[in-house]
């Protein structure tokens, strides 16, 4: 039997992993959509190769680690570390379109979750965003939302990677 806490985590996980949840995840597909928009011929194996490379070289060592740290810092209410993490990941996204897509998706996710969850850290993050004091990076916002929803780091990691793969 699953505990009530496990069921709550799984329900929250499904809720923000739903493709109808309005976060604009497609904007974070790291250019995969442009392959299809430009009618480029690409095989299934090539798509798998692109996704594997991005998971190993970008998403895993940067965005995933940032998300896990943001979740951890939110759980211990270390807002200064959340802010620092947000600034660092933003500075690592050298391509303007990727950086802007991360911000748009991150803030949209935070705003949506904030509508149905009462969380002090998430509210503070959104206030700091309005004041221009943080960027709203998607990986940071995701970690804060996972914490606000009571989702474990392991389940949040699976959700985060799943979101990248299907976007």
Where are these regions (language model features)?
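Internal, conserved structured core segments that host functional sites
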Residues: 64, 76-149
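A generic alpha-helix surface/boundary motif
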Residues: 26-30, 139-140, 167
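Inter-helical turn/loop segments and adjacent helix faces that build the functional surface
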Residues: 35-45, 116-124, 148-156
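Short, conserved micro-motifs enriched in small and acidic residues
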Residues: 18-26, 100, 136, 159
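Glycine/small-residue-rich interface belts in oligomeric ring/scaffold proteins
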Residues: 12-79
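A short glycine/serine-rich beta->alpha loop
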Residues: 13-22, 51-57, 91-98, 126-132, ...
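C-terminal auxiliary extensions adjacent to catalytic cores
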Residues: 40, 160-167
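Charged, compositionally biased N-terminal leader segments and the immediate start
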Residues: 2-13
């Amino acid at each position: 039997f699953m505990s009530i806490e496990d069921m709550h985590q799984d329900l929250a996980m499904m809720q923000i992993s739903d493709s109808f949840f309005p976060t604009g995840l497609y904007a974070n597909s790291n250019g995969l959509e442009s392959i299809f928009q430009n009618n480029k011929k690409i095989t299934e194996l090539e798509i798998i190769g692109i996704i594997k490379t991005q998971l190993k070289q970008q998403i895993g060592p940067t965005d995933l680690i940032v998300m896990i740290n943001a979740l951890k810092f939110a759980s211990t209410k270390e807002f200064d570390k959340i802010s620092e993490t947000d600034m660092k990941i933003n500075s690592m996204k050298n391509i303007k379109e990727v950086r802007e897509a991360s911000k748009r998706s991150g803030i949209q996710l935070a705003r949506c979750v904030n509508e149905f969850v009462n969380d002090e850290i998430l509210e503070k993050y959104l206030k700091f965003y309005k004041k221009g004091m943080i960027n709203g990076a998607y990986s940071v916002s995701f970690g804060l939302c996972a914490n606000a929803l009571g989702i474990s780091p392991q389940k949040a990691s699976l959700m985060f990677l799943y979101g990248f793969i299907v976007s």
